[in-house]
Design a protein with these regions (language model features):
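Hydrophobic face of alpha-helices
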Residues: 27, 75, 219, 320, ...
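Short, gly/Ser/Thr-rich active-site loops of penicillin-recognizing serine hydrolases
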Residues: 303-311, 416-439
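A generic structural motif
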Residues: 405-408
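Generic non-transmembrane alpha-helical segments
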Residues: 77, 81, 155, 221, ...
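Extracytoplasmic/periplasmic proteins that interact with beta-lactams or build/remodel peptidoglycan
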Residues: 1-88, 103-136, 141, 386, ...
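Short hydrophobic alpha-helical segments used for membrane anchoring or interfacial signaling
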Residues: 89-94
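Beta-lactam-recognizing serine transpeptidase/beta-lactamase-like catalytic domain environment
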Residues: 45-55, 95-147, 151-402, 434
């Protein structure tokens, strides 16, 4: 890549022809480690420019080698499993936040930047409607949909606004003022407790507890679980939008409305998050109060990088276990939204949460005549499919987050991908196969 004038002023090494330079991502962040030091030879020449003698000589020093946490085989499988879908998928180590794979689709060949790039090739990449230059796991911002419901459930437990024995009735509609807020199940779920509401992803249940909480408590809980954090390690990571009253006033100069709290309660509205945040949120839910920080550096010149937990005393471990039980039911209860993505292996039960995020407004007229199916909509109006998951349920090792743009409901689109990524992690890293249940 050609140097900018700004780069050329940073160090004399930036002006040496063919001297390697990191300009994006990890190579930019760790450029001072990787670059090394060029050798210097000072010589004397005569008036004709002929060599006379050497005055001084300093040997060059090699840069340091950096090993990433990425498992190349798992990385290749992750790309393969996304296939032709547009979106993101990643796998992290549940114990320490190490990123084992991170795939963005569509992708591009980075080697095109290692040589002179003609205008036609550049415009083809930069003007592509599917935006291959966006690193979706780190920079893609999406409504998290129902993958956000465990956050709302934990907030309700944290602030004592619900007990595990409490039940809320869902008839398919939640009236607020002069507007009806609908459940995805128009016939309703009946009476549900907290873990079953997570399992069946009941919107009405989460409308009710979101209204009890208010946006401030939801926002604060989300931030404690990692939403809105900025990780310096990942240059250019997008920061999620965790809205509250101040945020709306700052951005729209308008007061917050209760209906907006209901939308956030099901992961919609102004709320936006990145796939890496969804993975870290999952880790923070299942690690008994330990806060996980994402990491992609395994070692520098052979010296291992230890990515330690940070203790978080803001959540009751019993409350975290209740959320974990609800996520187990998502996959392993026959009424769970992820039931078709379960495994047969008791040593590798999967738990998780499916999500579907709307990108359009459904009119009252459409609800009356029948909501259009995704396949009958223009591609850009179809729902995003999401899934967060971990395995095994007991002593989790792997966490995945999957977002497939305009692929339809997460139960059918993203959950099978997430299941396969968790199974592949076990197979590739531990050499153990896992049987799935074919429904």
């Amino acid at each position: 890549s050609n140097l900018s004038r700004k780069d050329s002023k940073k160090s004399y090494t930036y002006n040496i022809k063919d001297f390697p330079l990191g300009i994006i991502g990890i190579e930019k962040i760790y450029d001072s480690y990787l670059r090394g030091t060029p050798g210097i030879e000072q010589i004397e020449v005569n008036a004709q420019g002929n060599y006379v003698r050497r005055l001084s000589f300093i040997n060059s020093k090699k840069g340091k080698n950096i090993q990433l946490t990425i498992n190349s085989e798992l990385q290749n499988y992750t790309h393969q499993r996304i296939g032709a879908n547009i979106g993101a998928a990643l796998i992290i180590d549940a114990k320490n936040g190490n990123i084992l794979s991170s795939a963005s689709s569509p992708s591009y060949d980075p080697n095109i930047f290692s040589k002179t790039l003609n205008k036609t090739a550049w415009e083809k990449v930069v003007n592509s409607v599917n935006a291959p230059l966006i690193n979706r796991p780190l920079k893609g911002l999406y409504p998290p949909g129902s993958t956000f419901k465990p956050v709302v459930a934990l907030a309700a437990l944290k602030y004592g606004l619900i007990k595990t024995t409490d039940k809320i009735f869902c008839n398919g509609v939640y009236p607020l003022g002069n507007r009806d807020f609908h459940c995805w199940n128009k016939f309703g779920h009946g009476k549900l407790n907290l873990t079953n509401a997570i399992a069946q992803s009941c919107d009405v249940f989460f409308y009710e507890i979101a209204l009890r909480l208010g946006i401030k408590k939801i926002s604060e809980t989300a931030k404690l679980l990692g939403f809105g954090s900025y990780y310096d390690e990942f240059f250019g990571v997008s920061k999620s939008i965790i809205p509250d009253k101040k945020w709306k006033l700052d951005h729209y100069n308008e007061k917050w409305q209760k209906g907006e709290t209901l939308n956030v309660g099901i992961g919609q509205g102004f709320l936006l998050s990145t796939p890496i945040e969804l993975a870290i949120m999952t880790a923070n839910l299942i690690n008994k109060g330990n806060v996980v920080i994402p990491n992609i550096i395994k070692s520098i010149s052979g010296e291992p990088i230890i990515n330690n937990f940070r203790k978080n005393n803001n959540f009751n471990i019993e409350h975290l276990d209740i959320i974990k039980q609800g996520m187990f039911k998502v996959i392993n209860s026959n009424k769970g939204t992820g039931w078709k993505s379960r495994t047969e292996d008791k040593e590798f039960y999967i738990a998780g949460k499916t999500g579907t995020s709307q990108v359009r407004i459904i009119s009252a007229n459409e609800r009356a005549t029948g909501i259009l199916k995704n396949k009958d909509l223009p591609f850009s109006k179809r729902d995003h499919g999401l899934f967060i998951g971990f395995a095994p349920y007991i002593k989790p090792k792997y966490i995945t987050a999957v977002v497939l743009e305009h692929a339809g409901g997460g139960s059918k689109s993203a959950a099978p991908v997430g299941r396969d990524l968790l199974i592949a992690s076990r197979r590739i890293i531990e050499g153990i196969d896992t049987n799935i249940v074919v429904s």
